């Protein structure tokens, strides 16, 4: 298969192919323009993969440009976080990082050009009055009483705005288009507003700041963007995008194309709702492993490759739809099943004593991956006292139960066959110790007499066990569409985080944050980057071995 045939196909790539074939463009230049007022989430990952992926596949360029036109909400912390997320996902921007604020002088000059052409005016209506005058979807707007000021008066007033002569909210610059337009975005939109706030890039040079719709199209043109890709909520804004570029003196006129945004089950994407989860302490921060943020997914153990694969699978369309969480989980599960080394950890431990085991212990050899001998093997200590999971033992059980039962045998993973003989309980009737015997001639082999032992359970040597905290993360919400609830906070899943104290094999003391493991028979886990210490490692469950929510939805 050729490189071109291996590329994903979608309507945007078809447009690009046609543009290149017709000679409209000789190269492809895209951009990813986040506002630095929060952390990126999985929805942004779709846009990142689309814009950078197209540039990569067509051997073009993709700019990283921060839409930093609102100094009140923006911060350098978000700038650095976004840069880190883009790089972590495996992409590299063309040239230096760009900022819309790089173009503030040019934007100001273009605003003056519109005033000189009679296409922009300074309005002194209050923000509330502007909303009132704008009209509705069924009623046209009405003209501002300040709409017909002369060019000279507008130039003087705009300079007064620039010089700090108006208070915030007392004046703005508006485009002069059509207050009766069926598209509300074209009813004399605001181009500049006043904000007395220090900007993280330009300091206190400016007290007037351009609006997104004015900034976006001009920044695209100044950078030579060929295909400006936005989500569908900006579809009507394309009219304003084109109007601005049609009415200023600029040699390049990019085209905007819209695609559907990513909606994912069992989570919310709204910045306001995500912020509420953080500020009300429903989660511990923007990088909480239950959050849909890229930093949260990374801390949970998601790989960049799995997120890229997810974005590839869901594709790019103009049709709004909601993607099943199982699709995202399937991508990370497939990735880690293929690439994660295996290890043993007991999440809900109960002591097991092998009464006829002689000696202090021994080392058993275990493969790091059952299907990849090239990943090597490791030595795991075994002894006469081990920890097993409480769910792996029953005093009585039916034939479907393939684990340890009183009076019956089971195999310890890569070790011996054992038989449960008796148990010891506390005053409440809880089992505290299981006493067993073992067949010394069954180390990693079948019993000599040919008897069949069907069940296999994992274990950790008690004398060598590494105490660990295990955080069992699950979906943050208990319903597929929490945003549709009257109060989305009321449908938070109370079991989205369950903390257990368990034991792991000693090799895991060398685990590093971001490195994934399959805890055999339990799921995929990674060392937590925030809470782990050398004395007490903390492991986060990335995803289970199978989709446990499938039955819930049936």
Curated annotation (Swiss-Prot):
UniProt motif 'KMSKS' region: location: 268-272
Motif stretch ('HIGH' region): 34-44
Effect after changing residue 256 to I: Loss of catalytic activity
Residue sites binding ATP per the record: 35-37, 41-47, 231, 261-262, 269-271
PROSITE patterns, sorted: AA_TRNA_LIGASE_I (PS00178)
Top-level taxon: Bacteria
Primary enzyme class: ligase
Similarity section: Belongs to the class-I aminoacyl-tRNA synthetase family.
Protein name: Glutamine--tRNA ligase
Organism: Escherichia coli (strain K12)
Gene: glnS
